[in-house]
């Protein structure tokens, strides 16, 4: 059984999703909440497998909440389910660990499939969003985008390993 938490500031959305998803085989909605702070409290109590998270919510938005959840509960999968496809929202949600980004126009079958897909360890991104992601990735690659490295996790790498990492980062292959 896939345990799902629904986070959206609109009660009608929460209730509708809960009613429909609870009819789907293998899916159980464990809680519905209206903001990011309630997400964190619910995660502590219910430990969902997947969170359906809106972007714009009061008290704490979905992007900030995604970062906090992934920092503390890395095994939980998060699907952003929103009407907003702004580049900044998409980039930051994926940067902080969202496994999916869907627009609210998705069908219920599409949403159910997305839940099962991210639960299995894969990603699910709306086709329009995927186009944005590819464009953003291309822009970053052209700009020699720099990634911060956690020194503690890399202190034992050899010079050869660093050289390989550098080449991969530049897009080289064997």
Regions found by a protein language model. Name each.
Residues 8, 54, 82:
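Active-site residues of response regulator receiver
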Residues 26-34, 42:
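Short hydrophobic/Thr-rich beta-strand motif most characteristic of the beta2 strand and flanking loop
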Residues 35-38, 61-64:
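Acidic catalytic/metal-coordinating carboxylates
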Residues 46-52:
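Active-site beta3 strand of CheY-like receiver
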Residues 53-54, 65:
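Active-site T/S-Asp motif of two-component receiver
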Residues 57:
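Receiver (REC) domain active-site loop signature in two-component systems and cognate sites
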Residues 89-94, 105-155, 163:
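Short, flexible helix-to-coil linker/hinge segments that flank and couple to helix-turn-helix
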């Amino acid at each position: 059984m896939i345990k799902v938490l629904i986070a959206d500031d609109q009660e009608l959305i929460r209730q509708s999703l809960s009613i429909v998803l609870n009819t789907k085989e293998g899916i159980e909605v464990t809680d519905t909440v209206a903001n990011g702070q309630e997400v964190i409290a619910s995660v502590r109590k219910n430990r969902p497998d997947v969170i359906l998270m809106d972007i714009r919510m009061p008290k704490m938005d979905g992007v900030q909440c995604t970062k906090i959840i992934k920092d503390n509960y890395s095994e939980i999968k998060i699907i952003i389910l929103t009407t907003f496809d702004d580049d900044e929202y998409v980039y930051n949600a994926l940067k902080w660990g969202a496994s999916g980004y869907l627009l609210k126009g998705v069908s219920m079958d599409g949403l159910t499939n997305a839940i099962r897909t991210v639960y299995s360890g894969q990603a699910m991104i709306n086709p329009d969003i995927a186009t944005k992601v590819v464009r953003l990735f291309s822009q970053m690659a052209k700009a020699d985008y720099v990634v911060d490295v956690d020194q503690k996790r890399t202190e034992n790498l050899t010079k050869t390993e660093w050289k390989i990492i550098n080449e991969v980062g530049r897009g080289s292959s064997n």
